[in-house]
Amino acid sequence: MTAVPKKISPQDGFFWKTKTLEEMSQAEWESLCDGCARCCLEKLEDEDSGRIYFTHVGCRLLDGDACACHDYANRSERVPDCVRLTPENVRTLSWLPPSCGYRLVAEGRDLYWWHPLISGDPNTVHDAGVSVRGRVEATETEVSVEDLEDHIVSWPALLPRRAKLKKRPG
């Protein structure tokens, strides 16, 4: 007797729709990162309101053109205040950008068309205008903490119009 063929679900292959954050393998977890590097921008917190302000100043390890860390494996040792994202903290980090794959999945939402897991192309995050490519004005080693206020920008906390589209613009 032959086995009854398994019915293919439209969810097959979309692990972020079927697994909890805690159930994901390390490779699956890492692949939720869309490569935008917005989380690698320096941020300021208003001590009175708790509001977070992004700057266009990158971490000293950020390659602003590649939108990647120069030393990802050792980032916590080299930058002690680098926040490692975990299934626990992505649910509470209010400064994660609205486009962040970790944030979207933690909130039970789907990934956007430009996310590499959807598009199959790591460049769509740049095509959609979501990444920091071309927008990092300096690194933290070039700007004093006292001067960070002069570098506050709003775009990292916003989703670009073309990124909101349901599918890749043609």
From Swiss-Prot:
Top-level lineage group: Bacteria
Annotated disulfide bonds: none
Name of a matching Pfam family: CxxCxxCC
InterPro entries the UniProt entry points to: Puta_zinc/iron-chelating_dom (IPR005358), UCP006173 (IPR008228)
Alphabetical list of HAMAP family matching this protein: UPF0260
Family, per entry: Belongs to the UPF0260 family.
The protein's name: UPF0260 protein RPB_3505
Species of provenance: Rhodopseudomonas palustris (strain HaA2)
